[in-house]
């Protein structure tokens, strides 16, 4: 069983004290190609491309121009699971997971990324900003199409080493489209979270993101390897709701 989640635009590069064996990014050649493209963008072009403020565009410009794709160590990079800092990761709270759970996560959790493709928890990453939906082309393909065959091939290779061949999709649509479901030789299971508002159940972005992190933590801490145990998730008021679920989707409501 492998979980996939989205990355986060917010990143924390404060040093941490750990004794983990960090790993290098999976797709180094592709990262070099992408970062070289990004380095050609001036501040004003970044602002338009990423639809961000001038100040933020300057920060992104600086990040990409200081990026060294040939060097990943503690001086310029940090393990991904401790770096991403958005709502999903606030639910995950990786810095409070014990060592054995982090080591388990290394083989059961993957983060999708516009720049890195697939990221394992202990892969070292440098500061960047490149959402999967960004309107750039590489080798004549839009970004998620560029990554699709590479990510899917790598996932199939990882699943060849897994006993339970189920992909738990806790990523957003923007990122999960970088996986070719038809070419993935495993079961695909989506998970959704809904809130009861005035008698109607709705998926609310900020709550769903944090819940994805909570679910990721639940699966990792409990070493869950089957769907029936996922249904037992009962955190932050969420419970499995069969009325909104089917064989390819588990929905949890509160």
Swiss-Prot record:
Belongs to the UPF0246 family. InterPro entries: YaaA. It comes from Francisella tularensis subsp. tularensis (strain WY96-3418). This is UPF0246 protein FTW_0267. GO terms for cellular component: cytosol. It comes from the Bacteria. One of its GO terms (biological process) is response to hydroperoxide. PANTHER family: PEROXIDE STRESS RESISTANCE PROTEIN YAAA, PEROXIDE STRESS RESPONSE PROTEIN YAAA.
